[in-house]
């Protein structure tokens, strides 16, 4: 006969399950931000390429609130890149594309790491859920056995 179900073990497993679930939510949000950053960088690369081909052609420039104004890009090969801490550097169009491609590689590596962590957490969650199910079945069997006496 198996040892009786220890309520402390059940409570401990529930706590771990809650913690892992919260961690998974945080990592999932971070992964979503990485994926959004990659999409945004790819869109910026496409825009820079189109601007280089168009030269000094008029474009619609968003100004917020769903509004755009018609503008002419005077120097499409001058791109100003924010590198953080309110620091902006001037790059050529190709330099900006190269910078974005490097950032994409970094974000893809981070996304890969986050995915691996999420997979490990998911495996741990499944193990805990399996153990909890075993304990619940065992507790039910104990109750049924005690009720038949």
UniProtKB/Swiss-Prot annotation:
Pfam families linked: Prefoldin
Predominant subcellular localization, coarse grouping: cytoplasm
Keywords: Chaperone, Cytoplasm
Alphabetized InterPro entries for the sequence: PFD_alpha_archaea, Prefoldin, Prefoldin_subunit_alpha
Compartments where found: Cytoplasm
GO biological process, one term: protein folding
Signal peptide interval: none
Family listed: Belongs to the prefoldin subunit alpha family.
Primary role: Molecular chaperone capable of stabilizing a range of proteins. Seems to fulfill an ATP-independent, HSP70-like function in archaeal de novo protein folding.
Summary of subunit composition and partner proteins: Heterohexamer of two alpha and four beta subunits.
PANTHER family with a match to the protein in the record: PREFOLDIN SUBUNIT 5
Annotated protein name in UniProt: Prefoldin subunit alpha
Name of the gene: pfdA
């Amino acid at each position: 006969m198996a040892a009786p179900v220890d309520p402390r073990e059940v409570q401990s497993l529930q706590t771990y399950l809650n913690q892992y679930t919260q961690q998974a939510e945080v990592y999932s949000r971070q992964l979503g931000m990485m994926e959004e950053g990659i999409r945004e960088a790819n869109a910026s690369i496409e825009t820079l390429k189109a601007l280089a081909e168009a030269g000094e052609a008029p474009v619609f420039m968003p100004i917020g609130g769903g509004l755009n104004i018609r503008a002419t890009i005077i120097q499409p090969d001058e791109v100003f890149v924010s590198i953080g801490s309110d620091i902006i550097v001037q790059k050529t169009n190709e330099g900006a594309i190269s910078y974005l491609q490097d950032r994409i590689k970094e974000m893809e590596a981070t996304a890969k790491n986050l995915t691996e962590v999420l997979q490990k957490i998911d495996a741990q969650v499944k193990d805990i859920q399996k153990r909890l199910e075993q304990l619940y079945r065992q507790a039910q069997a104990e109750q049924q056995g005690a009720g038949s006496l």
